[in-house]
């Protein structure tokens, strides 16, 4: 199995490729910002378009497209692909997408207009006139979405792999519908505020080891609705956390029998919410055992990752290997004192083979 970590701005986009014993398979998790596919201002194509063009030329498809949640830094690259490529749907065989309408139907609640995702496609390629439609209507019309809710506790087999869903819970979906209208945009709930990179790792660890330190969890209802999961291929396990909240993930891991004495062992953990300090806590790091921690962001927008998060990881696992997809983040977040105090392994990783 090969996992490619696409440069997705301050967002997420991962391409997983493997052979199921019969044919090559591809799973795409999120699409990053719109520039991940194509930047109209710079007239340059991003990693997502490069990878999709390669698959298309090779006669391969996206067997499963997972949209973890509807934040711009996860969905806009996908929307740009469907907007600019009128044959994009032909490459996609199946989609996981908890749309606002689907969640409302599942919960038998009124739909929230603010949760709709719009899509503009060329209705006439000669005139360049765009037609505005709902993204979910497009997916239904092209018959690539079965409208199945993806929710905590499900165990799904796709293309020779097993996926254990950790979030969202039904409670988190209810919160999304009931609270989102008052928090449209969610900027106050997701922003990383100023960078904390000036502070030493050692200082963070000493501060958090004090008995009176309290963890403050992310309050974004959109992030809480993220599809997070354990992916298993043969004897390899991978943890993809989207922008999920740690408490809900921990609760589900415990329900599956994992704890600090019987941790979930994975080959890779995609750190939640681009390394935000509000999405990874000590308890989660005790329940999940791995060497490889991947953080996807260029640090624009919300100033992620928080160095405090990396300090928590180092405190829990001094042998941690950090994987970044932007060199300036890898180079700037650790200072000389950090490297003197700890043996830090930080890499720029475009892909990993397992």
Which residues make up each language-model segment?
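Active-site catalytic pocket residues across diverse enzymes, especially alpha/beta-hydrolases
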Residues: 18-20, 56, 82-86, 253-257, ...
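Flexible, acidic/histidine-containing loops and adjacent segments that form or flank the divalent-metal
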Residues: 85-237, 320, 325-326, 336-354
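Long, well-ordered mid-to-C-terminal structural blocks that present hydrophobic/aromatic surfaces
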Residues: 225, 229-279
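C-terminal functional module detector
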Residues: 167, 173, 200, 211-215, ...
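Active-site metal-binding motif and surrounding structural segment of the metallo-beta-lactamase
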Residues: 43-96, 259-278, 287-291
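Conserved beta-strand hairpin/beta-sheet module of binuclear metal-dependent hydrolase folds
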Residues: 1-57, 221-247
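Active-site environment of divalent metal-dependent phosphoester hydrolases
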Residues: 10-12, 33-36, 70-75, 102-104, ...
